[in-house]
Amino acid sequence: MSSSRNFDLEYDDYKERRNAAGMGSRASSRNGGRFKPIDKEKEKEKKEIGDYGLPKNEYKMQGYDERSSDVGADPLASVRTLRNNLRVMSLEHRDKDEPVKSHLCQSACDDLSKAEKQLVDLSHKRSDAVVRGDSRQAEQIAKDMDRVKSDAIRNAYSDLMMEDGTMKAFGVNSKWTPDKNPMPSDDWKPMTPMKPRKRAETPKGRKTESRQSNRGNNDNGDQRMTSKATTRSPERRVIPTEPSKPKTTRKNQRLSTIGHVPEAIPVVDTPLPGGSTVQDDPYKMPTYVGRCPHCQLTESGLGRAGGMEKHFAKYCKVMTSCKYCMKLTMVSQLTDHLIYRCEFLQDTMEACNDCGLAIEKEDQKRGGSHPMCRGRRPPTGAQWCPLCTIAVEDNEENWREHLLNNCYNNQRRDGPEKDPWEMKQEQEDILLGAKEKKKREMEEEERLKKEAEIRRQQQQVVVNNTGYPGKMIDADKLVVALQEIQERKKAEKKKKLKDIEKET
C-alpha cells in the first residue's frame, strides 16, 4: 500500500511539473487516454518542409565567357565551321595514334551535327516569319538560334581541345583552352632573391669633403682652380721606345671611289630546283626560270614565288587532284590516297581483291566490281595506272614517260586540268541543253499534230456540206496553176499570129 501511494504522489508531482512547463495540452489526447509516443514513420509523414530562408543564387559559369564575334555572328555558319575544324583534328589525332582525343573530337562533331539540324529548321521558320512580316516571331527565333548555338558549343567541350585563338574567333573566352606554346616544366626555376649590393668603402687615409665646403666665399672661381691645381699630382711622361707608325688619313666613302674603276662582276651560275643551271646576269632582266622536279619541265616563271604551286595545281602531268577532297597527289599514289588518306571518303574504300585498285567496301561485300577492274593483279614490279589501267613499271622514269606520252585518260596532256566545279557546270549545261532540245522537239511534234487535226476537221466539214469526200485545194498551188495556163495561152496566141504573118 505504501508503495502504491508513493507512486501516486510521484505521478502527481510529475503532472504538476509537466503542466508548469506547458506540456499539458500535448499530453491530453482526443480520447483522453494516456500519452503515447508517435512512431518515427508517422512523424516523418506529418513533418512538413519549412522555409529555411536560403538565398536563391543563380548558377554562373566560371572561366567560360561568350561574346559576339565576326565568325560567330551567323549561328549556322559558326556551328558548321567548328564541326569541320573538329573533324580535321579528329583525323590528325587518329594519324598520331591518339585515340582518346580522336574520339572526343568525333563525339563533339556528332553533337554539333545534331545542333546543325535544329538550326536549319529554325532558319526555315525564321524565313517564313520574315516573309509573313512577323518581325517579333523572327526576332524570337533568332534568339533561339543563338541559344542553340551557345549550348552546342559549350556542351561539345570544344574549348578543351582547340587553341585559345581559335575559340576566341568563335566568341568564346575560356581559361580551359590549351596553350599553343606551353613552357616545359623542366625550364621553370624559382626566382632566387637578389643579393644585396655592397657599398664601396672609402679609403682610410683620404678625407671626404662636400662640394659646399670646397667652394669659397667669393663668387670667382680662381681660388677653386688654384686649389685643384695644387692638389693634383704631376703627370708622368712616358718616353716611347719605338717610333710611332704614321696614321692613315680617313676619307669620305664617296670621295674615295672617285677615279676608281670597279672590277667586273662575275656571272654566277644559279642552280635551278631541278638541278640545271642558268646564267643570272645582273645587268639584264631576271628570267625566273625554274624546273619542275616531277615532270622535268623547264619554263620561265616557275622560279617566281607561287609559280611552282600554280604549275602543280593545274599543269603538272605527273600529278592530279582527288575528285573527292580536291587535294593534289601524285598519279602513282592516287590509289593509296583514295584508300587510306582521303578525308572525304574516310575509310569507305579498300583495295579490290581482283586488281588491287580502289573500290567501295559495300560494292565488294555485295560481290560487285568497279568499271576499271582488269580482273587480275599487275605484273611483278609494276602497278596499274589509276587513270587508264595500263601496267606501268613502278619507278619515277617509267611513270613520267607513261603520263607524258602514253596515258590516254590523263586530262592534263591536252592542257590545264579543269576545275571540277567548272566540269560539273559544263555537264549541267549539256544536260540542260539536251532537255531543252527534247522539249522543242516535243512542242514541234505537238504543233504538227494540231495542224493535222485542224485539216482533218476542215475536210470533214466539206464532206458534211457537199457529200463529196474531196481533197482540200491549196490556194497557192491554184494560183500557180492558173498563171501557167495563162502563160501557155499567150504563147499559143503569139505562135498563131506569127504563122498568119508568114502565110500573108
Curated annotation (Swiss-Prot):
- Classify the source by domain of life: Eukaryota
Which residues does the annotated region (Disordered) include? 1-59, 171-255
Bias (Basic and acidic residues) occurs at: 36-50, 199-212
Q: Which InterPro entries does the protein's record reference?
A: CEP104-like (IPR052607), CEP104_Znf (IPR048738)
Q: Which Pfam families match?
A: CEP104_ZnF (PF21039)
**Protein's name according to its UniProt entry:** Uncharacterized protein C40H1.3
**Bias category Polar residues: which stretches?**
213-232
